[in-house]
């Protein structure tokens, strides 16, 4: 031992030691024990590259020096993975008692079960985030499309509003012009009407139409004959009506013609004297022209009415 030390010391004396300022300081390589037990957050970094089938590495105990030289890789079986998936669906959080129970049932170490649950939660969160991102992305795209369509509709409506405003302005100008023209026409008409009224007022008033006071005797006679019918219509005597030949002779005799002329003259004289007016009410003279009295009104005093002349 002394020789070895002496030899080593003697060799170290011959070897030159050079200190270069340009060399970078190299950090010491981390030990296995320091990497494994540096903290609880290092588990996620160590198992990020594990496969989805649940492969795990058996790193052995801490105090065994031979574990770093010969690392054995273990893979979980299909049945073990299915059982762990079912338990994860029930509850993704693993308690210590549940961890030990699952390890005993599946033939695994509790640390392996804990690591599998941790990795599975990380993948589940990633998938959940991806699903949420997809939903949000689809909603965003739909909202963007709706916003674009609404923007287009808004632009079209704004254009229509501008067109309507322009039309309203044009129609307003036309309406103002038309109103001005109508007012001018009305003013001209009122001026013309006033001028006509003034002209009529300056003119001399025209005399009223002349109404003739003297009417022809023929018209008066016709009116009297229309008021007083023929005497034959008022005869109610059965003795006179029985003698038809006497009636015919009476109508066509020359005395009858003279009597008719006398009656016409009498009616003309009565009309000129004002005995009967044109506005006599027939209701007041109903008894005057009823029966034999109507027949005797003119015939009693006439010579031709006597039956002795005809009998002789």
Swiss-Prot record:
Sequence ranges of Polar residues compositional bias: 23-33
GO cellular component, as recorded: nucleus
Top-rank taxon: Eukaryota
A single GO BP: positive regulation of DNA-templated transcription
Alphabetized SUPFAM superfamilies for the sequence: Homeodomain-like
SMART domains: HOX (SM00389)
Residues within the DNA-binding region(s): 69-128
Keywords for this protein: DNA-binding, Homeobox, Nucleus, Transcription, Transcription regulation
UniProt cross-references to InterPro entries, sorted A to Z: HD, HDZip_class_I_plant, Homeobox_CS, Homeodomain-like_sf, HTH_motif, Leu_zip_homeo
Region (Leucine-zipper): 129-164
PROSITE patterns from the UniProt entry: HOMEOBOX_1, HOMEOBOX_2
Primary site of residence: nucleus
Any GO molecular function: transcription cis-regulatory region binding
CDD domains listed in its UniProt record: homeodomain
Gene3D superfamilies in alphabetical order: Homeodomain-like
UniProt-annotated location(s): Nucleus
Location of the region described as Disordered in the Swiss-Prot/TrEMBL record: 1-33
Expression induction or repression: Down-regulated by abscisic acid (ABA) and by salt stress.
Tissue localization of expression: Widely expressed.
Keyword hit for DNA-binding: yes
Entry function: Probable transcription factor that acts as a positive regulator of ABA-responsiveness, mediating the inhibitory effect of ABA on growth during seedling establishment. Binds to the DNA sequence 5'-CAATNATTG-3'.
Family recorded in the similarity comment: Belongs to the HD-ZIP homeobox family. Class I subfamily.
Subunit comment: Interacts with DNA as homodimer.
Protein name: Homeobox-leucine zipper protein ATHB-5
Organism lineage string: Eukaryota, Viridiplantae, Streptophyta, Embryophyta, Tracheophyta
């Amino acid at each position: 031992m002394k020789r070895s030390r002496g030899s080593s010391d003697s060799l170290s004396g011959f070897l030159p030691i050079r200190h270069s300022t340009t060399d970078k300081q190299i950090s010491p390589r981390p030990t296995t024990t320091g990497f494994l037990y540096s903290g609880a957050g290092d588990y996620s970094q160590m198992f990020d590259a594990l496969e989805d089938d649940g492969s795990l590495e058996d790193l052995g105990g801490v105090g065994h020096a031979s574990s770093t030289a010969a690392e054995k890789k273990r893979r979980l079986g299909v049945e073990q993975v299915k059982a762990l998936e079912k338990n994860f669906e029930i509850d993704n959080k693993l308690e210590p008692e549940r961890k030990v129970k699952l390890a005993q049932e599946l033939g695994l170490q509790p640390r392996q079960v804990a690591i599998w649950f941790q990795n599975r939660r990380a993948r589940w969160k990633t998938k959940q985030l991806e699903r949420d991102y997809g939903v949000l992305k689809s909603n965003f795209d739909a909202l963007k499309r709706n916003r674009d369509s609404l923007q287009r509709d808004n632009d079209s409506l704004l254009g229509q509003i501008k067109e309507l405003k322009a039309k309203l302005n044009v129609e307003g100008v036309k309406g103002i012009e038309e109103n001005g023209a109508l007012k001018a026409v009305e003013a001209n008409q009122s001026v013309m009407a006033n001028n006509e009224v003034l002209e009529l007022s300056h003119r001399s008033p025209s005399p009223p139409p002349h109404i003739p006071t003297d009417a022809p005797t023929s018209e008066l006679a016709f009116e009297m004959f229309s008021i007083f019918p023929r005497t034959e219509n008022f005869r109610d005597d059965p003795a006179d009506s029985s003698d038809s030949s006497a009636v015919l002779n009476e109508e066509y005799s020359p005395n009858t013609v003279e009597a008719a002329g006398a009656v016409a003259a009498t009616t003309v004289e009565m009309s000129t004297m004002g005995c009967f007016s044109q506005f006599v009410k027939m209701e007041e003279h109903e008894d005057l022209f009823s029966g034999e009295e109507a027949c005797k009104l003119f015939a009693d005093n006439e010579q031709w009415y006597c039956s002795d002349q005809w009998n002789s």
